[in-house]
């Protein structure tokens, strides 16, 4: 049984110290595509946490029975099954959000973070550790996603969760929206500034 300190490290380390987007530069595509609104970013975060945690758990449980030659296929089959489950739940209970997320829920199957943790960690670790590692990496991914979405939605439209925060000029207020922040390239710049900020606070993450 894994000790509490180790589990805490697995849960919290990916959020700041070993963030999958900010340090490992993984999962960038969805960070560009689903961060125009906080709502979609949060839903995507929960979807990735669910898929990463349970794929890690199931792969770890059967890791000793998976032939090395087909391990990637087995991993993808498990991940794909979980992604289909998430997609069907969204279609049933949050159809509007499902439409907004479009193909990007399905593309969780090929998300480097999910595949990377399955191969690098779950195949070599105990089930509980693997499950917690999946949650931690999902949280780390989500922290960047939500941060980017917060900035993009607020500056781009003056809203958060679709509710007006800054009254726009068009509605008789003072705020002029900046449509640039609603375009995908803006997410690149925001992520770049976040990475710069993290590495300023943590110089040990700067590549030599």
Curated annotation (Swiss-Prot):
Keywords: Cell inner membrane, Cell membrane, Ion transport, Membrane, NAD, Sodium, Sodium transport, Translocase, Transmembrane, Transmembrane helix, Transport, Ubiquinone
Pfam families: Rnf-Nqr
This enzyme's EC code(s): 7.2.1.1
Subcellular location: Cell inner membrane
Subunit-level organization: Composed of six subunits; NqrA, NqrB, NqrC, NqrD, NqrE and NqrF.
Described function: NQR complex catalyzes the reduction of ubiquinone-1 to ubiquinol by two successive reactions, coupled with the transport of Na(+) ions from the cytoplasm to the periplasm. NqrA to NqrE are probably involved in the second step, the conversion of ubisemiquinone to ubiquinol.
Name this protein carries in UniProt: Na(+)-translocating NADH-quinone reductase subunit D
Species this chain originates from: Pasteurella multocida (strain Pm70)
């Amino acid at each position: 049984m894994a000790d509490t300190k180790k589990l805490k490290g697995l849960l919290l380390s990916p959020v700041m110290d070993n963030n999958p987007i900010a340090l490992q530069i993984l999962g960038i595509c969805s960070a560009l595509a689903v961060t125009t609104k906080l709502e979609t970013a949060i839903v995507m975060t929960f979807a990735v946490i669910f898929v990463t945690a349970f794929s890690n758990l199931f792969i770890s449980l059967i890791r000793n029975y998976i032939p090395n030659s087909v391990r990637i296929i087995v991993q993808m089959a498990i991940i794909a099954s979980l992604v289909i489950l998430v997609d069907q739940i969204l279609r049933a209970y949050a159809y509007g959000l499902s439409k907004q997320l479009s193909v990007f829920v399905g593309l969780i199957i090929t998300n480097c973070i999910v595949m990377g943790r399955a191969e690098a960690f779950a195949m070599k670790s105990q089930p509980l550790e693997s499950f917690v590692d999946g949650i931690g990496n999902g949280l780390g991914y989500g922290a960047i996603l939500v941060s980017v979405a917060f900035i993009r939605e607020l500056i781009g439209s003056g809203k958060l969760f679709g509710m007006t925060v800054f009254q726009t000029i068009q509605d008789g207020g003072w705020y002029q929206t900046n449509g640039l922040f609603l375009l995908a390239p803006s997410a690149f710049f925001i992520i770049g500034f976040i990475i710069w900020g993290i590495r300023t606070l943590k110089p040990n993450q700067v590549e030599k």
